[in-house]
Amino acid sequence: MKEMGLAYWHPVTYRLIEKILYGRNYRKHYEALSREIGDSSILELCCGDCQVVDYLKGNTYQGLDINPRFVNHAKKKGINVSLQDVMVSEIPEVECIIIHNSLYQFYPHHEKLIYKALQSAQKKLIISEPVINLASSKNRIISFIARWITRVGNNSSAKRFSRKEMEEVFNKFHAERIEFLGRNLMGVISKN
């Protein structure tokens, strides 16, 4: 766990950092995800602190994450989470899959993950990715600190997506809806 950045030391530090970064858009962001999920069964890839669960209304939820601290914390709260690397493990079939605040971690293999998720999503894939990032700051000190805080392992990508880049990804995968949520860009890719 030494190679994990501060954001991933514990779900409490993760949520605190998220609330600081999102500010007044924090709730709006999760409400938009919940609206798009609807009453579908859901699988969250790289589920982190499983915050989206608090915004769901009786959905069947499962999460996958590579961080044992996050997985153990979620399990203690009774949340269905498994310790898995989504790039090497099979992704179970479910109505709705979300990739939330984590696509950058898979760069330059992010499209491979999207294809893999689409194969397992029965109804839709929702991707919500930050496009306003301190890790992309022109101030080298700020960008260094932000990348250090959010690193996942020794091979973490320093890459963060711009709004234009995420729009291109969503267009490539024929997203039916794209919505800006104050910091994130959310795309909904339906299977219908």
Q: Where in the sequence are the language-model features?
A:
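Conserved class I S-adenosyl-L-methionine
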Residues: 1-36, 40-48
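A conserved beta-strand element that flanks and buttresses the S-adenosyl-L-methionine
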Residues: 98
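C-terminal alpha-helical "lid/dimerization" subdomain adjacent to the S-adenosyl-L-methionine
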Residues: 128-170, 177-178
